[in-house]
């Protein structure tokens, strides 16, 4: 059984998630909302993908900071890809890349986790 679970975390996979930032930043000070949101996204990706090395895309960072430090979006749709580290002397074998996913016109309601087939 331990071999199965270990193999699961070793796969290269891409998934789409909706992260509710509102509940994660509820008790946060105004002037710390955007930096804390980035930290919470990193924490979410670590837990979801099982990797310690999480890289946040520049576009996602811009989207979080687009309305300023204190008016963070309530929810954000992200695409998290677990990838192999090509660098030989890297500490971790895998890393997670978090990017912005396109939001449908009808909104974020009812969207669950979606596994994306590799386009490569």
UniProtKB/Swiss-Prot annotation:
Keywords: Ribonucleoprotein, Ribosomal protein. It comes from the Eukaryota. Gene3D superfamilies: 3.10.440.10. The keyword Ribosomal protein applies. SMART domains: Ribosomal_L31e. Disulfide bonds: none annotated. InterPro entries: Ribosomal_eL31 (IPR000054), Ribosomal_eL31_CS (IPR020052), Ribosomal_eL31_dom_sf (IPR023621). GO terms for molecular function: structural constituent of ribosome. GO terms for biological process: cytoplasmic translation. It holds the Pfam family Ribosomal_L31e. The keyword Endoplasmic reticulum does not apply. GO terms for cellular component: cytosolic large ribosomal subunit. Belongs to the eukaryotic ribosomal protein eL31 family. PANTHER family: 60S RIBOSOMAL PROTEIN L31 (PTHR10956), LARGE RIBOSOMAL SUBUNIT PROTEIN EL31X-RELATED (PTHR10956:SF52). This is Large ribosomal subunit protein eL31. It comes from Nicotiana glutinosa. The lineage of its organism: Eukaryota, Viridiplantae, Streptophyta, Embryophyta, Tracheophyta. The gene is RPL31.
């Amino acid at each position: 059984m331990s071999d199965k679970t270990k193999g699961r975390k070793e796969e290269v996979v891409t998934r789409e998630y909706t992260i509710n930032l509102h509940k994660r930043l509820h008790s946060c000070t105004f002037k710390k909302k955007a930096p804390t949101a980035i930290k919470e996204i990193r924490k979410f990706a670590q837990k979801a993908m099982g990797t310690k090395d999480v890289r946040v895309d520049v576009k996602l960072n811009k989207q979080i900071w687009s309305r300023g430090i204190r008016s963070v979006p309530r929810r954000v749709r992200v695409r998290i890809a677990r990838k192999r580290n090509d660098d030989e002397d890297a500490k971790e074998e895998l890393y997670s890349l978090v990017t912005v996913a396109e939001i449908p016109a009808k909104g974020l309601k009812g969207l669950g986790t979606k596994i994306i087939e590799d386009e490569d």
